[in-house]
Amino acid sequence: MTTESTPAITVVAAIIRGEDGRICLSKRPDNKHQGGRWEFPGGKVEQGEALSAALARELEEELGMAGAESAPFMTIAHQYDDLHVTLHFRDVRVWQGDPEGREGQRVQWFFPDELAGLCFPAANQPVVNAIQLPEQLVVAPEDITLHELLAGIDRLNGEQQGLYLRQWSDHAEVAAVVAQCQQRGVKVWLRAVGTQSVATAKALGVFAVHFSGRTLAQLDERPAFDGIISAAVHDQAARDKAGNLGLDMALVSPVLPTPTHPGKPALGWPQAELLMKGAPLACYALGGVAPGDLVNARDHGAVGVAGIRAFWP
């Protein structure tokens, strides 16, 4: 929350993606706010200026990148002790010229998995986590055999799709699924119902664990897990709790009506946006959405989309 004594600014920043998958970062000068830390290039948005225009201007001024085209990725609201910042992160994949520090700042390219070892301003941490995430989270159908599941994994695109296992009990079968996913470069989410399942997830080396809304309500602290921790979010109270616990990701649902839950009220895009945009963690839109809804979902604050029927290959 801002106060009259706390300055507030709006910033737009670029996730500049090279053809090899690396991300271009710059290092803040020591004499600036949050100096000496790595950041996603960008700057302040002038009053009345469109986000895309502001980012194109900043990238040309700072890095000599001409004609940068961008699309929404994630919006974060963050309160520092001395400043309230709203950051609009945008994907940049098209530009002209080689990025270079025109203001004396250091510029360097990093692979996404290298970002976790760098020092960023605190407000950037949710987007650092979000960059590790696939655009789509494919929820495995509950009534599927192991053979069908393994065959489906072979059809997934590991660069764009992750796999969420909601139902599992046989440790050997889950180990086989995780091993095949790792061979295919597919990140795995495993449903966690308690400390034992988190320990199992650790032992299996899965990328993420996911908690239901009911389990989230019972948590008092962030579980001890080195990977991504996700939770189901259906309302503001759950989103706030997930953020306060320092979780990394939320599945916000149901965004739209679904055949699996007939008659259950859906959030709708406007209400879903209130939960997703500005959230302190990465949000996926779940429920009634399809892979083709990604651009619309990002316009409403999500970093990705998730589902069963429209996603399972």
Residue ranges and their predicted role:
Residues R22-E62, F73, K187-R191:
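Conserved Nudix-box catalytic region and its N-terminal flanking loop in Nudix hydrolases
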Residues T2-C24, T75:
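Conserved N-terminal beta-strand and adjoining loop/helix that marks the start
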Residues A66-T75, R90:
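A short coil-to-beta-strand element that immediately follows conserved catalytic motifs
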